[in-house]
Amino acid sequence: ALPIFLDGNLLSENEKAMYRNVSMYMEDAESSFSINLLCQYLYRYYGKKVIVLLDEYDTPMQEAYVHGYWDTFTSFLRSLFNATFKSNPYLERAVLTGITRVSKQSIFSDLNNLNVITTTSDEYATYFGFTEQEVFQALEEFGLADKKELVKQWYDGFTFGNHTNIYNPWSITNYLDKKKIGAYWAATSSNTLINSLIQQSATDMKEKMEILLQEKEILVTFDEQIVFEQLQQDKNAIWSLLLASGYLKVLEVEQRGIL
């Protein structure tokens, strides 16, 4: 608990009691409004509206889908997002990051003024990873200038919008720290949903997977918006997930929605 909220007269006794009651065991109705209240208290103390940063917003959604409590969880999340991002007069702005672009109809239907940036967007493209210039400069500063080609072979390959040669920050920082090549990113991600869809996929999808394993190109139709309720029926959903997760990159867009 933050002393600024519990000491003095910033909060009333009822508000202090509500603040103390925040826990993983609280009721959903209270929990969904808790960030809104925190924004209110911070505004009262600092006199400024609050910026909310929410990382990996889609991770619990994937878990809810895989483990069978999707409807219950999305109902709660919709209430949480409404209270936090829409009916919150103390909010300056918010940034949500995640791997998948969840369909607006799932949890964002009540929100306005959303600016969605994806792997195919040019906006902020160079900020989702390290550029080659940044990586090579770091290698020189760490006395690893002779490892540029090796690092490029291992960690180059991401494309955001029209920007190619984007490097994974986690892999690069780990390499600079340990000075040893390794698949650092592979140990950090959960692929439960992707694995499930691949196992249930049709033969033609598996044939395309074999083509990819031969380092060849494929042409597929995809929609960057993930509609979890339709994953089992949408045979192209796996490509959307693989693209968003960084396993695929766009080489050429023939028309919107074509990879």
What are these regions (language model features)?
Residues A1-L259:
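Phosphate-binding site recognition
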